[in-house]
Amino acid sequence: MARLVLGLVSCTFFLAVSGLYSSSDDVIELTPSNFNREVIQSDGLWLVEFYAPWCGHCQRLTPEWKKAATALKDVVKVGAVNADKHQSLGGQYGVQGFPTIKIFGANKNKPEDYQGGRTGEAIVDAALSALRQLVKDRLGGRSGGYSSGKQGRGDSSSKKDVVELTDDTFDKNVLDSEDVWMVEFYAPWCGHCKNLEPEWAAAATEVKEQTKGKVKLAAVDATVNQVLASRYGIKGFPTIKIFQKGESPVDYDGGRTRSDIVSRALDLFSDNAPPPELLEIINEDIAKKTCEEHQLCVVAVLPHILDTGAAGRNSYLEVLLKLADKYKKKMWGWLWTEAGAQYELENALGIGGFGYPAMAAINARKMKFALLKGSFSEQGINEFLRELSFGRGSTAPVGGGSFPTITPREPWDGKDGELPVEDDIDLSDVELDDLEKDEL
C-alpha cells in the first residue's frame, strides 16, 4: 500500500513538473520544433494556451481547456505551450503572465489575445466567433496578410525585409557594415531552399523589429552570383553564414524554423549590443520615451546624495549597470532618480514605503508595475528581474491610471552633496548688555 501511495505521489509530481497535458488529450502540445509547422503554416484557426505547470490559474484552466479541445475537435485546433520550459516561444509572442491565450487566425504573424471567460463554454463560443470572422474575411477576399508561407521568391511582399545581395553589392552592405548579417546562399531549384524561404522571410521581419535593424537577414542566389559562392566555399543549398565585423564568417547550424532563426539572431544581437543606457530622470521626455519604447522600464530611486555621498551613489549605479548588461537581451529601459526628486512618480508606484533605495518595473503599455520588495543588492535585484523575465511576480496598476508628471531638474554633477549655506546674521546692532538686563 505504501508503495502504491508513493507511486501515485511520484506520478502526480511528474505530471506537475513536466506539463499539464498528455498525448491522450485532444489538446495538441506545441514546442519550438513543431509550432511553425503546426500553427504558422496552417490554414486553420488555432487557440493556443501559454502556461506554466506551477501556475495555479493554469491548473484550474486545464480541465476547461481539455473540454473545449474535445468539443472543437476537427473544427478548431486547440494547443498548449509549456512556456516555462519553452521560454523562446513565450518571449516571441510577448507572454508575460500565465495563462495567456492567443487566437491565431488569418494572419498567423499577428495573433489576437483572448480576453474571455475561463470556462469550456466561453472558450468554445470565442473560437466559433473567430471562425465565423475568418470565413467572412475569406469570402470578402481578405487573406489577413502573409501567413501560410506558400509564396515563392518572386513575391516581394512576403520577403520585404530580406536583403537581396549580389556579387556587386555584398562587400559594401555586409563586410563594411557594423551590423551582424545572417546570409542564406540558395539555388532557385532547391527544394530545401523553397521550404526555408517563408521561415527566412518571417524571421527577417521579426528580427528587424526586435533588434532595430542591428541584425539583418539576407539572401544570395548562388547560381547567379558565383563569385560569392566560390569565395565562401558554397557546395550545398541552402547554406547560411553569419558575418560579424572583424571576424571570419561562421556557418549557422541551428534549426530552420522562424523561431530557431529569430532565437539565434537575438543571441547574436545580445552578444554584440552595448549595455543599455542608464538614464537619470531629469525631464518628462526621457522618462516617457524610455518607458514607452521598451516592453519594461526599470526605475531605481536612490537615496538622497546627502545620505550616501558620491561614492555611495556610484556603487548603486555600478550594480544597476551590471544588471542592465546582464539583461540586455530583454531590451528593457533603465532609469534612476534620487529620493524626493520625482514625488508624483514615487507616489504612483508606491515607492518609499520600504525606504530607499527602491525599485519598480513599469509596463507603460498596460500601465502596470511590479515593485522590488527584496534587498536592493545585486542578488536581490537579479532575483526580482529574473521573476519578471519569466512573467512571474505580482503587479499593480500605476496610480492615477496614466504616466505620472515628471518634474524637470538639473542632472547630478557627480559630486558629493552640500548642505544649504545659511545666511550670516549681523549681530552688530544687538545690545547684549540690554539683553542681559531684560533677562534679569
From Swiss-Prot:
Gene3D superfamilies from the UniProt entry: Glutaredoxin (3.40.30.10)
Per the UniProt entry, what are the Gene Ontology biological process annotations, in alphabetical order? negative regulation of IRE1-mediated unfolded protein response; platelet activation; platelet aggregation
Instruction: Identify the keywords attached in UniProt to this record, alphabetized.
Output: Cell membrane, Chaperone, Disulfide bond, Endoplasmic reticulum, Isomerase, Membrane, Phosphoprotein, Redox-active center, Repeat, Signal
Top EC class, one word = isomerase
List the molecular function annotations (GO) for this entry.
protein disulfide isomerase activity; protein-disulfide reductase activity
The signal sequence is 1-19
Q: Where is this region: Disordered?
A: 139-161, 399-440
Q: Per the UniProt record, which EC number(s) apply here?
A: 5.3.4.1
* Localization: Endoplasmic reticulum lumen; Cell membrane; Melanosome
Q: Which reaction does it catalyse?
A: Catalyzes the rearrangement of -S-S- bonds in proteins
Q: Where is the composition biased (Acidic residues)?
A: 419-440
**Motif Prevents secretion from ER at which residues?**
437-440
Q: Where is the composition biased (Basic and acidic residues)?
A: 152-161
Where in the sequence is Phosphoserine found? Answer: S129, S156, S158, S428
The record's principal subcellular location, in a coarse class, is: endoplasmic reticulum
* A GO-annotated cellular component: endoplasmic reticulum lumen
The UniProt record lists the keyword Phosphoprotein: yes
Provide the disulphide bond pattern. Answer: C55-C58, C190-C193
Spell out the Pfam families in the cross-references.
Thioredox_PDIA6_C, Thioredoxin
The record describes its quaternary structure and partners as: Part of a large chaperone multiprotein complex comprising DNAJB11, HSP90B1, HSPA5, HYOU, PDIA2, PDIA4, PDIA6, PPIB, SDF2L1, UGGT1 and very small amounts of ERP29, but not, or at very low levels, CALR nor CANX. Interacts with MICA on the surface of tumor cells, leading to MICA disulfide bond reduction which is required for its release from tumor cells. Interacts with ITGB3 following platelet stimulation. Interacts with ERN1; the interaction is direct. Interacts with EIF2AK3.
- What protein family is recorded? Belongs to the protein disulfide isomerase family.
Q: What is this protein called?
A: Protein disulfide-isomerase A6
Q: Which gene encodes it?
A: Pdia6
